[in-house]
UniProtKB/Swiss-Prot annotation:
Keyword Signal listed: yes
Keywords for the protein's UniProt record, in alphabetical order: Cell adhesion, Fertilization, Glycoprotein, Secreted, Signal
GO molecular-function terms, A-Z: nucleic acid binding
UniProt-recorded name of the protein: Inactive ribonuclease-like protein 10
Function: Secreted proximal epididymal protein required for post-testicular sperm maturation and male fertility. May be involved in sperm adhesion to the egg zona pellucida. Does not have ribonuclease activity.
Family note: Belongs to the pancreatic ribonuclease family.
Organism: Sus scrofa (Pig)
Gene name in the database record: RNASE10
Length: 213
C-alpha cells in the first residue's frame, strides 16, 4: 500500500514537472511568436510608412507638374473681354481663323488642343520677329461662319468695312501675348476659352468679341 502511494506521488511529481516544463516551453514559444509578430508588424508599418512617404512625394511631384503646367499654360474664363489692338494696327479688331470641328488638331474634349502656345506656333513667320499680340480662333463649322456673313451688316469699328453679328455665342479661343516686347520663337501666350457673340468682317476675317454677351 505504501509502495503504491509512493508510486502515485512520484507519478504526480513527474506529471507536475512535465506540466511545468511544458508550460515553460509553451510560454517561451508563445513569447517567440509574439516577438516575431511584433517584428513583422513593425516591418510592415515601416514599409507602409515608406510607401506612403513615396506616394506623397509622387503626389507632390504630380501637383508640382500640374502647377507648372497651369502656370505655363494659363486657361481662364474672363467675365468680359474687350479686344483693343490688332497685330498689324490699332483698329480694335482682331484677325481670326475659323476651325472646323473636324480639324485634325482640334478636339472639343481636349483642352490642350486649345492651348495658345500650340495654336500660335503655326502663326509665327520666320521673316517677322515680332510676336503677334492677340489672335482669335473660332471653333465652329465653316457653314456657321458663312451663315453669319449672310446676316444683315451692322456698325463696327473697322473703318470702311462691313461687320456681321453672330446669332448665337461662338466657341472661341482668345490668345493674348503674356508680356509685350517678346520676339519669336519665344512667344508666350495666355489662353482664354470663351463662348461669346462676335462681330466679324467677312472680307478679311477680323473679329471683335461682344462684351457681356
Amino acid at each position: 500500500m505504501k509502495l503504491t502511494l509512493v508510486q502515485f506521488f512520484f507519478m504526480m511529481l513527474l506529471l507536475l514537472l512535465g506540466l511545468g516544463v511544458g508550460l515553460g516551453l509553451g510560454l517561451q514559444m508563445a513569447a517567440a511568436v509574439l516577438e516575431e509578430s511584433d517584428q513583422l508588424l513593425s516591418e510592415f508599418q515601416s514599409s507602409d510608412s515608406q510607401d506612403k512617404t513615396q506616394a506623397t512625394k509622387k503626389g507632390a511631384g504630380t501637383r508640382t507638374m500640374e502647377t507648372l503646367l497651369l502656370s505655363d499654360n494659363v486657361v481662364m474664363q474672363p467675365e468680359e473681354t474687350i479686344l483693343s489692338e490688332d497685330e498689324v494696327g490699332g483698329n480694335k479688331m482682331l484677325r481670326a481663323q475659323a476651325f472646323s470641328q473636324s480639324y485634325p488638331n482640334y478636339l472639343r474634349s481636349d483642352l490642350m488642343d486649345r492651348e495658345c502656345n500650340t495654336l500660335m506656333a503655326k502663326k509665327m513667320k520666320p521673316y517677322n520677329h515680332t510676336c503677334i499680340s492677340q489672335y482669335i480662333f473660332i471653333h465652329e463649322e465653316p457653314d456657321e461662319i458663312k451663315a453669319v456673313c449672310k446676316s444683315p451688316p451692322v456698325a463696327c469699328e473697322l473703318k470702311g468695312g462691313k461687320c456681321h453679328k453672330s446669332a448665337r455665342p461662338f466657341d472661341l479661343t482668345f490668345c493674348k501675348l503674356s508680356k509685350p516686347g517678346q520676339v519669336t520663337p519665344h512667344c508666350n501666350y495666355v489662353t482664354f476659352l470663351l463662348e461669346k457673340h462676335i462681330l466679324i468682317s467677312c472680307n478679311d476675317m477680323k473679329v471683335q468679341v461682344m462684351s457681356g454677351s
